[in-house]
Amino acid sequence: ALAPFGINACTLTGESAPDERRQVFAGLRDGSVDIVLTTPEFLVCHAPEFAATDRIGFVVVDEAHHIGLSRAGHRPAYAQLGSTIAQMGNPVVLALTATSDEAVTSDIDRVLPVAGHVVDDTMRTNLHVVDQRNLRNRGDYLATLVAQGEKSVIYVSSREQSVALARNLRKRVPQMAPLIGFYNAGLSRAERTRVEELFRTGAIAVLVATSAFGEGVDIPDIRNVVLFQLPYNEIEFNQMSGRAGRDGKDARVHLLFGRSDVKHNDRILQDMTPDHDVLAEVYRTLRTWQRKTPGEFFEMADGELARIVSGAGCEITAASAACGIAVFRELGLIETHVAYASGEGARMVRVKEGAGRVELTDSVRYREGLGERDIFKAFYEWVIDCDCARLEQRVSGPITPQMKPLHLR
């Protein structure tokens, strides 16, 4: 889109081939590449290469509220952007988000070199809440809604649920089956792009998705957003609801979640920050594997670690294993790095010998995970009992800090 204006924009992500990466970095150095679209994870990992080009003068951080949500392992690269940007010579930074309360804004200010704030409190009066919280037969309600054929996004709280609900709807509403798809972070980037394009063009009319769908996606004619299950916090609630009616025409946000969802979300949060006994078993397993290769790094993916620990009688998920790796690394109990072969990365682990006694609560990652549970508790207590008028007001407006805006001339 920018080529007619003489601007060369390229994309770099973890899925970019080595040759493509070399070409883009070479283009940055010689001036033939003007803009690089990338992810925080790629930027943090490749900060030295970006810095070496000596041409980075402007950095845009979209969906900057993730800086405030980077606790408990939620895209932690966002929290590292400040030091990464400093490595590149402190270029001008523009941070953008529609969901930034005072706490999140403070986090953004702390991490990024932000000099001022521009706040837009515009209300989206075309959005209307359909309150069906705690509905006993929400599956029937959803099937009836899908049968109407309007472009709709249905949000659920896990990847597995996105696949299961899409299959269920295809069976219950067979006339719509070819038009029902699913979207989650487990799909490859190419698959996600393909599904998004099918939904944009109308080849898919109903999309069952996790929160992975939405941010950065501007599809104007979504008439229905369905919160089938309970979101995890207020920012996620607003981000999901805000996908509806971006063309300015009337759109509806259907609230189908209820108290029965609380236990499901609690379990997922528990998996992401498991208790002491689970993490102790994960650490014992790592030490056992280390004894097979004394002093050397060994390959250990989250899923494989979860399988081994579960096989020993302590059932855990890959999310719990990932938490253990992150916490142990922070506490200085292990070292990790990624080894690449044929373009594929593998996580390598080495358990440090002679590490002293540590407490889990010495880990910021662990404490933040516990904090996520508190945030969820406060959110569900509010959203379950809040009256519909207040919920519609929340859906219609952005989450902004209560501060004096910077007036530009």
Label every model-predicted segment.
Residues 16-58, 66-69:
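Conserved helix/coil segment N-terminal to the catalytic DExD/H
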Residues 32-35, 55-58, 89-94, 151, ...:
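Loop/turn-to-beta-strand initiation segments
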Residues 43-44, 66-75, 102-103, 216, ...:
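Catalytic P-loop NTPase motifs of RecA-like helicase/translocase cores
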Residues 47-92:
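SF2 helicase catalytic motif II
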Residues 84-87, 92, 99-147:
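Interdomain hinge/linker at the junction between the two RecA-like core domains of SF2 helicases
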